Amino acid sequence: MSEAEARPSNFIRQIIDEDLASGKHTSVHTRFPPEPNGYLHIGHAKSICLNFGIAEDYQGQCNLRFDDTNPVKEDVEFVESIKRDVEWLGFTWSGDVRYSSDYFDQLYQYAVELINKGLAYVDELTPEQMREYRGTLTAPGKNSPYRDRSVEENLALFEKMRAGGFAEGTACLRAKIDMASPFIVMRDPVLYRIKFAEHHQSGNKWCIYPMYDFTHCISDALEGITHSLCTLEFQDNRRLYDWVLDNISIDCHPRQYEFSRLNLEYTIMSKRKLNQLVTEKVVEGWDDPRMPTISGLRRRGYTAASIREFCRRIGVTKQDNNVEMMSLESCIRDDLNEHAPRAMAVLDPIKVVIENRAAGEEWLTMPNHPNNPEMGSRQVPFDSEIYIDRADFREEANKQYKRLVLGKEVRLRNAYVIKAERVEKDAEGNVTTLYCSYDAETLNKDPADGRKVKGVIHWVSVAHALPAEIRLYDRLFNVPNPAAAEDFLSTINPESLVIRQGFVEPSLADAVSDKTYQFEREGYFCADSRYSRPGALVFNRTVGLRDTWAAKATQ
């Protein structure tokens, strides 16, 4: 299959193919323009993969441009986080990082040009009056009493705005288009507003800041963007995008195309609601492993490759649709099943004493991956005292239970066959210690007498086990569409985080956060980037071995 044939086909790529074939464009230039007022989430990853992926596939360019036109909400912290996320996903932007604030001087001159053409005016309606004058979807708006000011007066007032002569909220620059337009975005939209706030790039040079719709199209044009890709909520804004570029002296006129945003079940994408989760301490922070932020997914153990594959699988369309969480989880399972080294961890330990074995360690060679010899092997200690998981033992059980039962045998992973002989209990009747015998001739082989041992369980040596905090992360919400609830916080899954104190094998002593392991029979886990350190290990569950929510949904 050729590289072109391997590309995911969608309507945007078809448009690009047609533009290149017709000679409308000789190259492709896209951009990813986030506002630095928060952390990127999985929905942004879709846009990143689309814009950077197109540039890569067509040997074009993709700019990283920060839409930094609101100094009140923006911060360098978010700038650095976004740059880190884009790079972590595996993409490189063309040239230097760009900022809309780089173009503030030019944007101001284009605003003056619109005033000189009689296409913009300084309005002094209050925000409340402006909303009243705007009209509704079924009723036209009405003209501001300041709409017919002369060019000279508007130029003077706009300069006064720039000089700080108006208080915030008392004046703004508006485009003069059509207050009766059926599209509210075209009813004399605001182009500039006043904000007395220090900007993270330009400092205190400006006290007036351009609006997104004015800035976005001009920035695209100044950078020579060929295909400006936005989500569907900006579809009506395309009319204003074109109006601005049609009415200023600029050579390049990019075309905007819209695609559906990502709606992922069991999560929310609203920046306001995500911020509420953080500020109300429902989650630990923006990088909480339950959050849909890229930093949260990274801390949870998701790989960049799995997120890119997810974006490839869901595709790009114009139709809004809900994507099942299992689609994302399937991508990380597929990736980790192939690439994650194996290790053993006991999350709910019960002590096992092997009575017919002398104390003393024996080092067993275990493969790091059962299907990939190239991943090598590791040495794991075995001794006469081990931990197994409490769920792997029953005093009585039916034939469907394939683990350890009193009086019966089970195989220890990559080790020996053991038989449960007797138990020791506490005053409440809980098993505290399990006494077993082992067959010394069954190391990685069947019993010599031909008896069948069906079950296999994992274990760790008591003398060598490393204590670890195991954080069992799950979906943050317990309904598919939490945003539809009257109070989305009422749909929080109370079991989205369960903490266990367990033990892991010694090979994990130096586990690092950017490496995810399969804890055999438990799931995929990574060391927590914030808290885990040698001697105080903390592991986050990335995803279980199988989807347990599908079964819940049918109950």
Swiss-Prot record:
EC number of the protein: 6.1.1.18
UniProtKB keywords: Aminoacyl-tRNA synthetase, ATP-binding, Cytoplasm, Ligase, Nucleotide-binding, Protein biosynthesis
Motif ('HIGH' region): 34-44
Reaction(s) catalysed by this chain's protein: tRNA(Gln) + L-glutamine + ATP = L-glutaminyl-tRNA(Gln) + AMP + diphosphate
UniProt main location, coarse: cytoplasm
Subcellular location: Cytoplasm
GO molecular function per UniProt: ATP binding; glutamine-tRNA ligase activity
Binding-site positions, ATP: 35-37, 41-47, 231, 261-262, 269-271
CDD domains: GlnRS_core
Coiled-coil intervals: none
InterPro entries recorded: aa-tRNA-synth_I_CS, Gln-tRNA-synth, Gln/Glu-tRNA_Ligase, Gln_tRNA_ligase_bac, Glu/Gln-tRNA-synth, Glu/Gln-tRNA-synth_Ib_cat-dom, Glu/Gln-tRNA-synth_Ib_codon-bd, Glu_tRNA_lig_a-bdl
GO cellular component, one term: cytosol
Highest taxon above the source species: Bacteria
UniProt binding sites for L-glutamine: 67, 212
PROSITE patterns: AA_TRNA_LIGASE_I (PS00178)
Motif 'KMSKS' region per record, residues: 268-272
Gene Ontology process terms (BP): glutaminyl-tRNA aminoacylation; glutamyl-tRNA aminoacylation
Recorded family membership: Belongs to the class-I aminoacyl-tRNA synthetase family.
Quaternary context: Monomer.
Name listed for the protein in its UniProt record: Glutamine--tRNA ligase
Organism: Yersinia pestis
Lineage of origin: Bacteria, Pseudomonadati, Pseudomonadota, Gammaproteobacteria, Enterobacterales
Name of the gene this protein is made from: glnS
